[in-house]
């Protein structure tokens, strides 16, 4: 599914709203799932655990700020590049939110070796 500017705005807004609620509850935003092009469950588990235990300043704020500045044809924000370099990510980053009706909506950011964003897309898993 190709992403329009309107779709992207809606998804970013929703991510920010979920993040605000989670930060009020004192929990970090564990729905961020980073993955390689082929999913390695161990990698996903490792990242999830890292985020749960991390003492990063307000993860929800950190990632949402970064996601707001992701644009096709531009380099990934330095905060995201630095985070991903710690874990040797390949060419894709995925931000997922689980909705109440058991659907998972993901913003998929694909980038090249120079960390320039090649494509933004939305995937919905039911």
Model segments located where?
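Short helix/turn-capping signatures at newly exposed starts of structured segments
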Residues: 1-93, 102-104, 113-126
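Phosphate/anion-contacting hairpin/loop surfaces
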Residues: 96
């Amino acid at each position: 599914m190709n992403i329009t500017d309107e779709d992207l705005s809606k998804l970013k807004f929703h991510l920010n709203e979920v993040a605000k609620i989670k930060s009020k509850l004192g929990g970090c935003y564990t729905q961020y799932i980073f993955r390689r092009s082929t999913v390695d469950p161990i990698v996903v588990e490792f990242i999830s655990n890292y985020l749960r235990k991390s003492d990063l300043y307000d993860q929800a704020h950190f990632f949402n700020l970064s996601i707001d500045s992701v644009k096709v044809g531009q380099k990934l924000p330095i905060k995201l590049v630095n985070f991903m370099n710690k874990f040797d990510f390949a060419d894709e980053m995925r931000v997922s939110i689980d909705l109440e009706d058991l659907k998972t909506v993901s913003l998929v950011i694909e980038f090249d070796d120079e960390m320039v964003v090649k494509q933004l897309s939305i995937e919905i898993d039911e």
